[in-house]
């Protein structure tokens, strides 16, 4: 995975140090993340068997707006008691991939989704489905690149199950076809 910024701020998480990949990620340092409060035990077990897709229910149209969104959602979630941003990765309206908590950390989950603990990667699209948002083909491609990279590096099982939002059917678009 090719970084678009300096080293990852978490010295134990080398999730963005693979320079031989086509996947480009805006690292936590690049978008201005605060230090995570996630306990070291809150880790994903690889390869994960589930990938969940979400919308952020917000809009951001540029790199600057997307970076600002990442900072604001992290700040709000940490203020309300979560340990960090609630996504592993976020695909911006600018079609760039932003590192949330990355490949190795479990996001904070609501009680009804506790069955996914340790076994699910969350990828969010910046946008609001209730306002008629549909990810662009470039955003879908960025999400597919995340999945392909995850499978290649054994972060995601090649037989993973995709968990789409209610009423949203991205399955055809997001399963990497070989």
Q: Model-flagged regions — what are they?
A:
Residues 102-118, 122:
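Short, surface-exposed glycine/acidic/tryptophan-bearing loops
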């Amino acid at each position: 995975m090719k970084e678009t910024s300096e080293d990852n701020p978490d010295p134990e998480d080398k999730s963005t140090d693979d320079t031989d990949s086509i996947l480009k990620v805006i690292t936590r340092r690049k978008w201005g993340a605060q230090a995570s409060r996630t306990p070291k035990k809150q880790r994903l077990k690889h390869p994960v068997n589930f990938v969940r897709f979400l919308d952020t229910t917000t809009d951001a149209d540029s790199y600057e707006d997307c970076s600002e969104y990442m900072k604001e959602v992290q700040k709000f979630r940490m203020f309300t008691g979560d340990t960090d941003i609630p996504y592993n990765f976020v695909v911006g309206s600018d079609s760039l991939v932003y590192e949330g908590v990355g490949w190795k950390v479990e996001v904070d989950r609501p009680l009804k989704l506790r069955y996914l603990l340790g076994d699910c990667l969350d990828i969010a699209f910046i946008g609001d489905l209730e306002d008629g948002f549909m990810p662009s083909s470039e955003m879908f491609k960025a999400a597919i690149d995340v999945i392909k990279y995850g499978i290649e590096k054994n972060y995601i099982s090649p037989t993973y199950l995709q968990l789409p939002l209610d009423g949203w059917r991205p399955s055809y678009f997001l399963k990497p076809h070989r």
